[in-house]
Amino acid sequence: MKELNTQEFDTHVLENEGIVLVDFSATWCGPCKMQKPILEELESEVDFDIYSVDVDRSPELAGRYNVNAVPSMMLFKKGTLKNTLVGFQAKEVILEEVEKLK
């Protein structure tokens, strides 16, 4: 799962014509550590892009999207934010939310 910085975010997320999941997380966050393997597993199974943003390394992105808790997963479609999932999420929940965007 590729970690994006501010410069890469616009290209990989906002200019993407498909569905993109962005996981805003932090290295010190326990639930984030539990979420990461689920997202890595999903990445090999799905037809949409999954990226991560470290809120400590990219605080401007966290601020831009008002990330107040981690993990926060944001779903974008054609560059527009469509949904935010806050806290640890089961794989099935993530897939259900993505299906709603198709």
Q: What is the role of each PLM region?
A:
Residues M34, S44, K78:
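Short, conserved catalytic or interaction motifs in soluble domains
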Residues K2-I19, P59:
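A short beta-strand-turn-helix
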Residues L4, F24, L39, E43, ...:
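Thiol-based oxidoreductase modules, predominantly thioredoxin-like and allied folds used
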